Regions:
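Residues at the start of alpha-helices and the adjacent loop-to-helix junctions
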Residues: 2-7, 127, 138, 225
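C-terminal/domain-edge helix-coil "capping" segments
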Residues: 21-43, 137-138, 150-254
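A generic structural signal for short, solvent-exposed coil/turn residues
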Residues: 10-13, 39, 72, 180
Length: 254
C-alpha cells in the first residue's frame, strides 16, 4: 500500500469515527507461551535451597526457597516435597581444605557479598554426585536450586519525572521533566538451576536481573523490595515448568 493510500485509509477511519459510523472496542486476548523444559517424567519437585548473599538485611536464599515452594504448590501440576532447604554455603565451606580467614567469619555478614564471592561457591551447582545423592534421598524428583544475590545499589543521574500543571484553558496537563537525582534501592540476580534427581545431571538453567530504585529520602524495607522484584521474575521462572498465558488487549473496529 502506498503512503497516499495509507493516509486516505486513516482519514476515512477518522471521518467514520467522527460521524459515529464506527465503534472501537477492546477485547482481552491470551497468548500461550510454551514451557521451556519437559517435566513430564517428574511427578514431584524439590526446592532444595540456594546459594544466597548480597545484603545482610535479608536472607535471600531462605526467602526464595519459601516463595518458590508457595508458587509451585498453586501454579504447577507437581507435588512439592516438604523438606528443609539445604545450607549450600555451609556445605561448600565444609569441603574447604583451607579454613576461611578470621575476617570472613563475622556472624552478621553473608559469606557471599558479590559476583566474585559467588564464583567461589558455584561449583556445587554442577556437582553431579552430590545432587544424585540428594535425589536418591527423595526418590528422584525434579530438583530446583541455584543462586540468588540481593544487594543494595545506588545510582546518580538524570531521570524523567512527570509534572502535572494547569494550562491557560484550565485543563490539567502532564509533562515529563528531566532532572538530576540520587537514588538508592536493591538489585536481584537469581539463577535458577533445574536438576534431574535420578541422575544428578543439570537439565536447564536461567539467570535474571532486576533493579528497584527509589528516592534517596525514601525508606523502603528490604523485604518489600525483594517481593516487588520477584513479582517481575516469577512468570519467567514458572514458564520453565509449564505453559503460561500472557494476557493483553486488542482494539477492534466494528
Amino acid at each position: 500500500m502506498t503512503a497516499r493510500a495509507v493516509v486516505a485509509v486513516a482519514s476515512l477511519a477518522a471521518g467514520l469515527a467522527t460521524a459515529g459510523c464506527v465503534n472501537f472496542y477492546e477485547v482481552t486476548v491470551e497468548t500461550p507461551i510454551q514451557a521451556k523444559l519437559d517435566v513430564t517424567p517428574f511427578q514431584r519437585v524439590l526446592v532444595a535451597g540456594f546459594l544466597g548473599g548480597g545484603t545482610k538485611n535479608l536472607d535471600a536464599a531462605a526467602e526464595t526457597s519459601r516463595l518458590l515452594r508457595s508458587q509451585l504448590r498453586t501454579k504447577s501440576g507437581m507435588r512439592v516435597i516438604d523438606a528443609d532447604a539445604l545450607q549450600l554455603v555451609q556445605e561448600v565451606d565444609k569441603r574447604r581444605t583451607t579454613p576461611l580467614p578470621p575476617g570472613d567469619t563475622a556472624q552478621d555478614e553473608p559469606r557471599i557479598k558479590n559476583e566474585a564471592d559467588l564464583k567461589e561457591y558455584e561449583q556445587i551447582l554442577t556437582d553431579t554426585e552430590f545432587w544424585k545423592k540428594v535425589g536418591q534421598e527423595y526418590q528422584g524428583p525434579l530438583i530446583i536450586t541455584g543462586s540468588v544475590l540481593f544487594a543494595e545499589v545506588t545510582r546518580s543521574g538524570v531521570i524523567s519525572k512527570p509534572r502535572q500543571y494547569t494550562d491557560q484553558m484550565g485543563r490539567v496537563q502532564v509533562e515529563e521533566r528531566r532532572e538530576f537525582a540520587n537514588q538508592k534501592g536493591y538489585s536481584l540476580t537469581p539463577k535458577f538451576v533445574f536438576i534431574d534427581g535420578r541422575t544428578g545431571v543439570q537439565l536447564y538453567s536461567e539467570s535474571f536481573h532486576e533493579e528497584a530504585l527509589y528516592s534517596e529520602s525514601q525508606n523502603t524495607p528490604a523485604l518489600s523490595s525483594y517481593f516487588e522484584l520477584m513479582d517481575k521474575l516469577l512468570p519467567g521462572f514458572l514458564n520453565t515448568l509449564s505453559t503460561q498465558k500472557i494476557k493483553g488487549t486488542r482494539v477492534l473496529i466494528k
